[in-house]
Amino acid sequence: MKSPLKLYFLPYISPGHMIPLSEMARLFANQGHHVTIITTTSNATLLQKYTTATLSLHLIPLPTKEAGLPDGLENFISVNDLETAGKLYYALSLLQPVIEEFITSNPPDCIVSDMFYPWTADLASQLQVPRMVFHAACIFAMCMKESMRGPDAPHLKVSSDYELFEVKGLPDPVFMTRAQLPDYVRTPNGYTQLMEMWREAEKKSYGVMVNNFYELDPAYTEHYSKIMGHKVWNIGPAAQILHRGSGDKIERVHKAVVGENQCLSWLDTKEPNSVFYVCFGSAIRFPDDQLYEIASALESSGAQFIWAVLGKDSDNSDSNSDSEWLPAGFEEKMKETGRGMIIRGWAPQVLILDHPSVGGFMTHCGWNSTIEGVSAGVGMVTWPLYAEQFYNEKLITQVLKIGVEAGVEEWNLWVDVGRKLVKREKIEAAIRAVMGEAGVEMRRKAKELSVKAKKAVQDGGSSHRNLMALIEDLQRIRDDKMSKVAN
């Protein structure tokens, strides 16, 4: 039996990146390999409960003072403006020499780092160990990004931001508009240069690891491997492996503001596929007028629902009175009739989605939420906002055909979400399309994918085989290196 590997995991300090990569780290630790997650002091509190005999944390103080940040602000979930985001990014860059020193003085057998740490590719090369790139996205989205590069990119051939174009060269016909592309794709800027730097660092790396399963987008895994010249390991959905018990589902990295019993007792009273779940991830705070439109659409749709709303808890000093974002008597009426539940803060999303009464999900199309929706087998209403979320929308609606669009027309920076209102009529129509008779076929396809997701993570499933194959590859590389040193 080969000796265990020594692996370092370096997650980006944002929930959408930290949660899936820490879950990936746990998969390796559960196989008996020695895993160290490198993170900052405040972020360690989110991960401490996952430490075991084979999973430890290495803590590095973030130089917040040098970056002009308040003590304890160490995660992008706490950032609401571009100036603070820039300071946090700068503070993170100051950690590079400290992390390099730690890794160099205690070399691992492999470095698994988020794409936002391109310098780890050169560090791994110096240490003669493989670097695995972690993308907090799916390979379909990565293929879409590749299609938007170069002088022949399809968005360069249209005459307006709202003219529909086909993304050529993909396994499926995919259509979108220029307005739905990230700003750094539409008009190259400094971030475009960063994207190219991250891409070059990826090409130097051993391969790519994603929280997905091969059967979801197999043609895109092969397509991307051919473009980039290295292998893709789909080893998810990690939540399906790690959070099979309801205790795990309700307490992931962040603490939910409602208890398991409160959620389950309400959901248990509902018919199968009758509840619509609304949540826009860990960072989205819509303006009041957009929240009002969502509430009005939920009310007029007739659907039973759970709605998770950030920034509207009673302790939030920026929160206006409920009359600013809810129709008069809305919450009281929903409670009295049992039609709806509003969760003001972090919701136990996996627990909710996995309940048989939930049949639909309105999502911002962040990859973690998307793969959780797929795993649960629910139809989706897509409401992309920024990052690669419009690409994920096209996967859901055009390739997998398990959802409908809410009607969001423009990509925005995360600080500008809700600038262009999506009206209640569009929202209501999308909810009815997923939850009504028209959504039966969508939900059927979603259930089929859910079955495939669960099979993928079982012993002998594609994700389990990929995990074991990657471990074998890394052990072979380590053993070959040791043999050369010995000779």
From Swiss-Prot:
Mainly expressed in flowers and flower buds and, to a lesser extent, in leaves, stems and roots. Coiled coil: none annotated. Pathway: Secondary metabolite biosynthesis; terpenoid biosynthesis. GO terms for molecular function: UDP-glucosyltransferase activity; UDP-glycosyltransferase activity. The active site is at residues 17, 114. Signal peptide: none annotated. InterPro entries: UDP_glucos_trans. Belongs to the UDP-glycosyltransferase family. This is UDP-glucosyl transferase 73CC6.
